[in-house]
């Protein structure tokens, strides 16, 4: 099929994108990048995919823009049938490949699952997702089951210093200056 090599499972896998439908008859695929700048997905190599429970390394042969899409060519994937077998595969790398961040900057993956508490000590819940709004990122927080305000989900802007007072990845807590009733 393709030039995919069996690989060991990554220690700390992170999904950078997903392979979409095939494009053309020569094995090209659409790719959906989850990186902030879509083209940054190509800065992280090698890519890993998981097929039938097995980790495999896939080698990028080339890529280009096509209309609004990015399409890729993988080594050894030379026809539409081979490309179709990779549709919906997540593109994964080990997080050790990501660059170190400056103090006060965080990868979204590191914030997922953190408990969010107010400066007064009220537990708002757990971060389950992040959203990009253009002006700032937003924490999507699943409220605790017995939330005193009957809220199921909260959206809290990730404004460092203004709303976000402290992030402690060791204890997996984020302290915020936020009204729990909002």
Swiss-Prot record:
Please give the GO cellular component terms listed in this UniProt entry: cytoplasm; ribosome
Query: Which biological process terms from the Gene Ontology are attached to this UniProt entry?
Result: ribosomal small subunit biogenesis; rRNA processing
Q: One Pfam family, short name please?
A: PRC_RimM
State the UniProt keywords alphabetically: Chaperone, Cytoplasm, Ribosome biogenesis, rRNA processing
GO MF annotation: an example: ribosome binding
Task: Provide the PRC barrel domain boundaries.
Answer: 102-182
Compartment annotation:
Cytoplasm
Q: Spell out the SUPFAM superfamilies in the cross-references.
A: PRC-barrel domain, Translation proteins
Key word Hydrolase present in the record? no
Q: What is its main location?
A: cytoplasm
Q: Which Gene3D superfamilies match?
A: PRC-barrel domain, RimM
Q: Which InterPro entries match?
A: PRC_barrel-like_sf, PRC_RimM, RimM, RimM_N, RimM_N_sf, Transl_B-barrel_sf
This protein's record includes keyword Chaperone: yes
Function in brief: An accessory protein needed during the final step in the assembly of 30S ribosomal subunit, possibly for assembly of the head region. Essential for efficient processing of 16S rRNA. May be needed both before and after RbfA during the maturation of 16S rRNA. It has affinity for free ribosomal 30S subunits but not for 70S ribosomes.
Sequence similarity: Belongs to the RimM family.
Q: Which HAMAP family match?
A: Ribosome_mat_RimM
Task: Please describe the quaternary structure of this protein.
Answer: Binds ribosomal protein uS19.
Note on domains (UniProt): The PRC barrel domain binds ribosomal protein uS19.
The protein, known as: Ribosome maturation factor RimM
């Amino acid at each position: 099929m393709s030039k995919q090599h069996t690989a060991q499972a990554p220690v700390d896998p992170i999904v950078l994108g997903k392979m979409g439908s095939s494009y053309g008859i020569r094995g090209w695929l659409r790719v959906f990048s989850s990186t902030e700048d879509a083209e940054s997905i190509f800065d992280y190599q090698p890519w890993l995919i998981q097929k039938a429970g097995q980790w495999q390394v896939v080698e990028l042969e080339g890529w280009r823009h096509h209309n609004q899409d990015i399409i890729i060519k993988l080594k050894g994937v030379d026809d539409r049938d081979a490309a179709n077998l990779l549709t919906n595969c997540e593109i994964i790398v080990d997080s050790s490949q990501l660059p170190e961040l400056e103090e006060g900057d965080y990868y979204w993956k590191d914030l997922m699952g953190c408990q969010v508490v107010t400066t007064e000590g009220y537990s708002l819940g757990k971060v389950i997702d992040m959203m990009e709004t253009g002006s700032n990122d937003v924490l999507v927080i699943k409220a605790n089951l017995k939330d005193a305000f009957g809220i199921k989900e909260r959206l809290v802007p990730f404004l460092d210093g203004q709303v976000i007072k402290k992030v402690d990845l060791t204890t997996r807590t984020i302290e915020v200056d936020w009204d729990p009733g909002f």
